[in-house]
Amino acid sequence: MKEHNYSVYMLASRSRVLYIGMTNNLHRRVWEHKNDLIDGFTKGYKCHRLVYYESFDDVANAIDREKQLKRWNRTKKEWLIHQRNPTWEDIAGEWYLRHQYKPEKQVPPRAG
């Protein structure tokens, strides 16, 4: 049986506009948001900072949690973020650095 992992996450813009979503691949989904590959709210409001997430083994639990968080008022959402990420740093800020272009070291040819 294939093991699944689901995440409920919150993205924020620089002005702290919040977006709540759910995915089965957090790294991929955040990368899509950061690169504006998804038309809609996050692209329009530039919600590119991952400020909070939770992981679930069961998709139904993840969906329930996403719906619950979306019903919460702004103050309660900010309280939750502050518990784990008081400065609202981008949790995914360094996830993709290895994908940036870095020239390889030049190896001198062997004398032969």
Predicted regions and their residues:
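GIY-YIG nuclease catalytic motif and its immediate N-terminal context
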Residues: 1-38, 43-53, 60-67, 84-86, ...
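Short arginine-rich
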Residues: 44, 68-80
